[in-house]
Every structure is written in C-alpha cells, then in structure tokens.
Amino acid sequence: MEWVWALVLLAALGGGSAERDCRVSSFRVKENFDKARFSGLWYAIAKKDPEGLFLQDNIIAEFSVDEKGHMSATAKGRVRLLSNWEVCADMVGTFTDTEDPAKFKMKYWGVASFLQRGNDDHWIIDTDYDTFALQYSCRLQNLDGTCADSYSFVFSRDPNGLSPETRRLVRQRQEELCLERQYRWIEHNGYCQSRPSRNSL
C-alpha cells in the first residue's frame, strides 16, 4: 500500500512542476515568420479585448509589404460610441521589425481622432498563412513578468471561420498564452460593407 501513496505523491509533484509559465518572455512565436506570405486579407473571427475603446465586430484587416520589406496594415470594424451610436471605424498601422521576425512594434491610429492610438508589441504567435493566424499584444506587464493588459486576435482567411482541427490547434496556443476562455467570437454580417458613408469614420 505504501508504494501506492508514493506514486500519488510523485504524480502530485510532477503536476506541480508542469505548471505553465505565464511570463510574456516565455511565449513562443511563429518560427521563421514570412511577412510576404502573411500579407493579404484576414478576417478577425475571435478576440480577447484590452482596456479601452476597441473595434467590436465585422473586423477585416489587410496586411501589405512594400518594396523595402516594410509591413503595414489597414483595418475596418464596427465600434459602439456613447452606448448607442454604432459606426464603422478605419484603423491604420505600421510595423517596425525587431530581431525576431515574428515580433514587431506596431504604431497604430484611428482615422477619427478619438479612436485609440498607440505603439504596441505585435507578435504573430502562429499561422499557416493560408487559413489561420493568432496574434498577441501585451501593453503592460506586471512586476512578475506576466501581462496586465493584453489583446489578441484569431484571424481566418475565410469569414466563415476555421475547421475543427485548426480550432483545436488555436485553442492549444491560446492556453500557452494563458488566455484560455478569454476570447469571444466576432460576428461578420456585412455591417461595414453595407453602411452609408455617414456611418463611417
């Protein structure tokens, strides 16, 4: 009987040592990230929100790379202002390379002056370029190196979403970011494609 308790104790010790490392510096990103393959149209199908005003749904982003290899992006999505005023907002972003090809500094701003602007880390956690991408940004770190204010997008080339197999892979990577069950699905109903110009910013 003693050996049974010994096995239980070993299992408990093993489980404790296998705890996730939620420090931002420990997060894996896409190896050998290729900006050119990543360029093009992406539909945001799920997101983890940061603090503050943020695009809510119908979010479409288009990434491009110029002849000098610099990446930029434009995005459009629905945002709610003053509780009941819904508009389609345009955002612009430029990216500065770092030593890691999957980690960028992203300077972004809204075409309308009251929309958010900033200069955030922008990491590509994973992508296969053809179907899905998982992006992550940490705006503020705690003293222990974990993230105090983050946001993350799940992108798809198809507005209808991802296959079950790809969703399982994305969920695994979300867990590695310590963000499981913190995402919400994003609706795509053509809202920003059907709005008159007076409802756009």
UniProtKB/Swiss-Prot annotation:
Keyword Signal in annotation: yes
GO cellular component terms given for this protein: extracellular region; extracellular space
Chain sites annotated for binding substrate: Q116
Keyword annotations: Disulfide bond, Methylation, Retinol-binding, Secreted, Signal, Transport, Vitamin A
Pfam families reported for this sequence: Lipocalin (PF00061)
Gene Ontology process terms (BP): cardiac muscle tissue development; detection of light stimulus involved in visual perception; embryonic organ morphogenesis; embryonic retina morphogenesis in camera-type eye; embryonic skeletal system development; eye development; female genitalia morphogenesis; gluconeogenesis
Subcellular location: Secreted
One annotated GO molecular function: molecular carrier activity
Disulphide-bonded residues: C22-C178, C88-C192, C138-C147
Entries under InterPro entries matching the protein: Calycin (IPR012674), Lipocalin_ApoD (IPR022271), Lipocalin_CS (IPR022272), Lipocln_cytosolic_FA-bd_dom (IPR000566), Retinol-bd/Purpurin (IPR002449)
Superkingdom: Eukaryota
Signal sequence region: 1-18
Omega-N-methylarginine: modified positions: R139
Function: Retinol-binding protein that mediates retinol transport in blood plasma. Delivers retinol from the liver stores to the peripheral tissues. Transfers the bound all-trans retinol to STRA6, that then facilitates retinol transport across the cell membrane.
Family: Belongs to the calycin superfamily. Lipocalin family.
Assembly information from the UniProt record: Interacts with TTR. Interaction with TTR prevents its loss by filtration through the kidney glomeruli. Interacts with STRA6.
Name of the molecule in the record: Retinol-binding protein 4
Natural source organism: Mus musculus (Mouse)
